[in-house]
Amino acid sequence: MKKNLKYLLALCLTIALVFSLAACGQKADETPNDAQDDQQTEQEEFTPANYSIAALKGPTAMGLVKLMKDSESGETTGNEYTFTLAGSADEVTPALLKGELDMACVPANLAAVLYNKTEGEIEVLAVNTLGVLYIVENGESVQSMADLKGKTIVAAGKGSTPEYALRYLLTENGIDPDNDVTIDWKSEHSECVAALASGQASVALLPQPFVTVAQSKIEGLRMALDLTEEWKNLAGVEPVQ
């Protein structure tokens, strides 16, 4: 009886092992097919598209450099991109509202305005620049925000981040931006650089890379104040620009 029981147990174990191996073999056979089906599904779902993107000259467009290069060399997975660089946000907004652009890099405050104006049809995807604004001077008289009192500052970006950041910092440092300083607004940052180069201005509000460009052209031009650090000194936190 014990002998028969041993044979029965051995037979059961053998049958179980056979079914186990068969199941493993079936799973191994199915795995490549499943992977192939997933790959085919992904290929079927991907449809190359043409995208029209606009950005402002300067730091706003710097984040697009790699995409521009990849698009030019055909390394963008089949998608095609058309890029437009503008001098001011006013040049971008109409095209964006008309649907002539798929994406645009604009000042943060304008992004909020566009979101509300289109009732959410235009959405914010990302913030791609932080801490790029500087006060530059051809001289040594500006060592703090307080030293800007009585100065003329050439700047670009009226109605957007540069203006709001500058006015806030001036006000918080006891300087009335409407009466204690003169802000000469230009339409583009390149005009500020030209004013510095010609000697028409000695102090300017500039973002990178215009600061570096200006320093390469104008001997003695220095970064007098880092607005990121000035904001941090007041608020105790990093600014979101």
Language-model features: locations:
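C-terminal motif of bacterial Sec signal peptides marking the signal peptidase cleavage site
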Residues: F19-A23
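Bacterial signal peptide processing site
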Residues: G25-K27
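Short, polar/charged alpha-helical segment
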Residues: E42, N50-Y51, L56-A86, D90-E91, ...
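Flexible hinge/capping segments at coil-to-helix
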Residues: E44-E45, E137-I153
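Short beta-strand->loop
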Residues: I53-K57, G150-T161, N173, D178, ...
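A bilobed periplasmic-binding-protein/Venus flytrap-type ligand-binding module shared by bacterial periplasmic
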Residues: K66-M68, L133-Q143, A235-Q241
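Short beta-strand-to-loop elements that line the ligand-binding cleft
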Residues: E80-G87, C105, P177-E188
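Pocket-lining segment of extracytoplasmic ligand-binding domains
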Residues: N109-L110, T118, I183-D184, S190-Q241
